Amino acid sequence: MRQFLTALIIFALGLPTFAETRKVHRSDGARGICLGCEDRGDKSVDQIRALRSAVGGDQSYKDIYKYNYNKQKDRKVAEVCSSMVTNTGYGPWGRHILNILNEREYPNLFDGTPDLVSLCPAYPQLGPEEKKVVFVAIMNVMVLGESTCGAGPHTAKGPNGTAVGILQLHRGKEASYESEGRHGHGPEIGCKNGDGEKPESSLKCGLHLLDMQFAAKGELLSRSSHWEVLRPQGRKQKHKWTKKIVSELSICK
């Protein structure tokens, strides 16, 4: 209903239904989408955002909660993942993600990737606060897939050591993830040994690793990702969880 009302208002005001994404020329002469750019001369994007907020505000937490609620017939996922989102708003983990995400520390997340845009066509036009919501959704399925939102075993033995916490980071080896390079990050940003033990530090480290993945691979869904829900070749095909939750976000349409 909210989307219908937004479309109706846009039509009445004579605004374009879809904002034109600015095109850029690469050095090889090909044309592409500037994922992190906005055309400041085109006010229609800001007008559409304002209309969306006026109609109903940010209801994205409801989209994430709906995904969790419908994940299993017994509705247990919505209950165990309440630290991320509830039917009334963001839980402490969701709020933590919204609070720590910023364009300086995680520039590649805010720029996005082509496969993220394919799942969320509106991503290039979203404002910073809306982009943060997309990563609450992504982190939601990541902690669901790795630890059932903390309800599963705290540790697990693996070939590379003991995985620990809600994102199953390698205990005592979290800082070694830096070996792939900081990609311009400052010295205070990244993962530290022990981050996997607590949810808040796990989430920050996880976002940092995802930012590094975006920079190195240019993909949300990557065969070399640390997490199964982001690996398209995974035996259980959990990457489909990520595709589903992102594509069903109202702000992405």
Which residues are covered by each model-predicted region?
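Catalytic glycan-binding domains that act on GlcNAc-containing polysaccharides
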Residues: D42, R49-K253
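N-terminal regions of proteins, emphasizing targeting and processing segments when present
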Residues: L13-G14, R49
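Cleaved targeting-peptide boundary
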Residues: E20-R26
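Short, hydrophobic/glycine-enriched beta-strand segments
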Residues: L5, L35-G36
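Sec/Tat signal peptide C-region and signal peptidase I cleavage site
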Residues: L15-A19
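Disulfide-bonded cysteine-rich modules in secreted/extracellular proteins
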Residues: G29-A30, G36-R40
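Sec-dependent N-terminal signal peptides
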Residues: F4-L13
